Amino acid sequence: MNLLELSEQEIIRRNSMEQLRQMGIEPYPAAEYVTNAFSKEIKETFKDDAEPRPVSIAGRIMSRRIMGKASFMELQDSEGRIQVYISRDDICPDENKDTYNVVFKKLLDIGDFVGIKGFVFRTQMGEISVHAQELTVLSKSLRPLPVVKYKDGVAYDGFNDPELRYRQRYVDLVVNEGVKDIFMKRAAIIKTMRTALDEAGYTEVETPILQSIAGGASARPFITHHNSLDIDLYLRIATELYLKRLIVGGFEGVYEIGKNFRNEGMDRTHNPEFTCMELYVQYKDYNWMMSFTEKLLERICIAVNGTSESTIDGKTISFKAPFRRLPILEAIKEKTGYDLEGKTEDEIRAICKELKMEIDDTMGKGKLIDEIFGEFCEGTFIQPTFIIDYPVEMSPLTKMHRSKPGLTERFELMVNGKELANAYSELNDPIDQEERFKEQLRLSEKGDDEAMFIDQDFLRALQFGMPPTSGIGIGIDRLVMLMTGQTTIQEVLLFPQMRPEKTVKKDNADKYVALGISEEWVPALQKAGYLTVEMLKNANANKLRQELCELNKKYKLELQNPTVQEIEAWIANVGE
């Protein structure tokens, strides 16, 4: 990278890196640095009347207060921050004081990683700190961190632009308090869920991500191409059909926690790549699954928050079991006044028009009902509510209701106005399943690009016999949002999907050389703001010469300064 492409701070840090090497100090050492303590644990276990505890810690410098022969710095490790007291004569016990006077005071910067060996003590101001006796450079930071200042728990000069935070999550995690805690809670949520499923005796499995048929859900898939086989493949939209094959194969219960992909919109609650847990258990039904789910979520909430309640967007949500259960058609009648039971597709389409909804001819009966529920009902369910007994047209993989014709044994769990889970008494009648797939094919031919494909191998598996089974899918990302009080899905994804970062257009050196400009002057011209030769067209020759001369001197480029006449010739050549 050319020197002129760097900021002044970056240049200073690179110079410091080279000076460290000249002193025989490797700024990126390869050897293991052994630590025996962390900031949080040091503070929690400190006792004033105990013998001074020797510690070896490491972390990132987050602030410094440099004085004369003694200074302070704040070190951030994986658990938090701790103050370190640096005394010149303690870290430099002999005549050579360079470690303090040069390395610490001049060549180290905020953002650098160092190792400290010393002992724990309490300062006169009452702060538990580490008294350094040895300092080791572990990694030199070449870019300055944004400095976020905190006073009374309020951040100032914050690194808070959402796009920057999501693109540079590595910076966000370092400088913004509380961000890392979200992802530690995410890990705890998944760990608690996995532990509960393992304790229940269910087997964690892995199924294909690349699939020849995008089945298991109604969604638009991502398509890719396998060069060796010369076939199109789909990134899975769900794990359902493969997991049910394993139930056919004799597993009592199977689950998978993994990524699914849906080529659909992005908003505050949707990301095209998302994490889902799917579970299938033989000899169970959707009533059992509702009971299992509410107990599981209550356990997770207590494990993460210490209580069965979570707060999000000013609302307190109780995950204390049991949850309310409400049939979907009753929910629609309750919110819109329309009773859809027994209505035909044409009658429901007419109701949609009366409700002034935007619909189109590709939507079948199930899609129309789904649109009504989504627009008028879904957002009203704040406390956990099982919406149950969906019409068969909305549920191509679900068993028919045992006592309610035209309905299925399916539920969706609504929390804070969004779907968190989807579950069924699974359809295990292969003939019925084939008819449902054919109906989905009809919808696909009608133009519904979210209709399911016919999976002949899955039908073949069902024909060998699948026991009565209940299954559920829980959206992990939305669950983390609920448990951590976040209102956007991007806040619970370490690296959410984003548009490619815009790059500044720059002409290559050849275009400048064609104007008669020496190649060695190109970086200086671009540093001065002339990123393309076209930008030179209206330049003032005298002003440009002054800028180039200043850059030549400031950065010690040692170039022969151009004359005004030479620059005028460059500008004239742009128009030719």
Swiss-Prot record:
Where does it live in the cell? Cytoplasm
For this protein, the Enzyme Commission number is 6.1.1.6
Extract one GO BP annotation from the record. lysyl-tRNA aminoacylation
- Source species, domain of life: Bacteria
Cofactor(s) needed: Mg(2+)
Q: Where does Mg(2+) 2 bind?
A: 419
Cofactor: binding details: Binds 3 Mg(2+) ions per subunit.
Query: Which residues does Mg(2+) 1 bind?
Result: 412, 419
**Mind listing the GO molecular function terms for this protein?**
ATP binding; lysine-tRNA ligase activity; magnesium ion binding; tRNA binding
Q: Which PROSITE patterns match?
A: AA_TRNA_LIGASE_II
Q: Which Gene Ontology cellular-component terms appear in the entry?
A: cytosol
Instruction: Please give the catalytic activity noted in the UniProt record.
Output: tRNA(Lys) + L-lysine + ATP = L-lysyl-tRNA(Lys) + AMP + diphosphate
- UniProt KW keywords: Aminoacyl-tRNA synthetase, ATP-binding, Cytoplasm, Ligase, Magnesium, Metal-binding, Nucleotide-binding, Protein biosynthesis
- Description of how the protein assembles with itself and partners: Homodimer.
Describe the family membership recorded for this protein in Swiss-Prot or TrEMBL: Belongs to the class-II aminoacyl-tRNA synthetase family.
Q: What is this protein called?
A: Lysine--tRNA ligase
Give the species.
Parabacteroides distasonis (strain ATCC 8503 / DSM 20701 / CIP 104284 / JCM 5825 / NCTC 11152)
Q: Which gene encodes it?
A: lysS
